[in-house]
A protein has these predicted regions:
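A detector for small-residue-rich transmembrane helices and their helix-helix packing motifs
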Residues: 1-197
């Protein structure tokens, strides 16, 4: 049993580091007074706190939120890390999360959103999408990677139709998926070129 666990996390340095940072930030958010003002993305305060474009995608508000996000992230990210490298996982996570944050910004005033947002879903879904682009038929929990991404996209759309007020979160999620797919296709092309040399 222990050997299986070791084998499962072997070579997952970036994956585990990102999960650890998310856990530390979550604990800080629920225990340290006013730290949310420093870490969460608030469109009204972005010029004062530009770093929140990054810190927001290491943040979670509820235990179930971080549990689901990090569980999903671990499953896909460790596969991407085995296939590529720790550096690649980190770059994809940061890129998808950052673009997700930027995408959120113009939608906030459209729906009259005021206050901070929280969540790593754009970054997490982006990493999953990158792996799915590279290995679309790879089986994860009895489902193909490409089907998991399709399910995320459809689910996000259904929730948006049912509640347009989540537009800002949905926009960031879409951005994460799209950027992740672009990263994954680029990595796949690079992989194919290397195999020819």
């Amino acid at each position: 049993m222990i050997d299986k666990v070791k084998k499962g996390i072997e070579g997952s340095n970036a994956t585990l580091a990102i999960i650890l940072i998310n856990i530390i930030v979550y604990i800080a958010l629920i225990t340290v007074p006013n730290i949310a003002d420093i870490l969460l993305l608030d469109p009204d305060k972005i010029l004062e706190k530009p770093w929140t474009l990054v810190t927001v995608f290491f943040s979670h508000e509820w235990l179930i939120h971080i549990f689901l996000n990090m569980g999903f992230f671990f499953i896909f990210s460790r596969q991407l890390e085995k296939l590529t490298s720790s550096t690649t996982v980190l770059i994809v996570y940061l890129t998808c999360g950052f673009i997700g944050s930027l995408t959120f910004m113009p939608f906030a005033p459209l729906i009259g959103w005021s206050g901070p947002v929280v969540g790593a879903s754009a970054a997490v879904w982006g990493v999953a999408a990158a792996f799915a682009a590279m290995r679309p038929d790879f089986l994860i929990l009895k489902g193909k990677a490409k089907h998991w991404i399709a399910a995320l996209f459809v689910g996000n759309t259904v929730l948006l139709v049912l509640n347009p007020q989540i537009m800002i979160g949905a926009a960031a999620h879409y951005a994460g998926i799209v950027v992740g797919l672009i990263c994954g296709y680029w990595l796949k092309i690079r992989e194919q070129k290397r195999s020819l040399t």
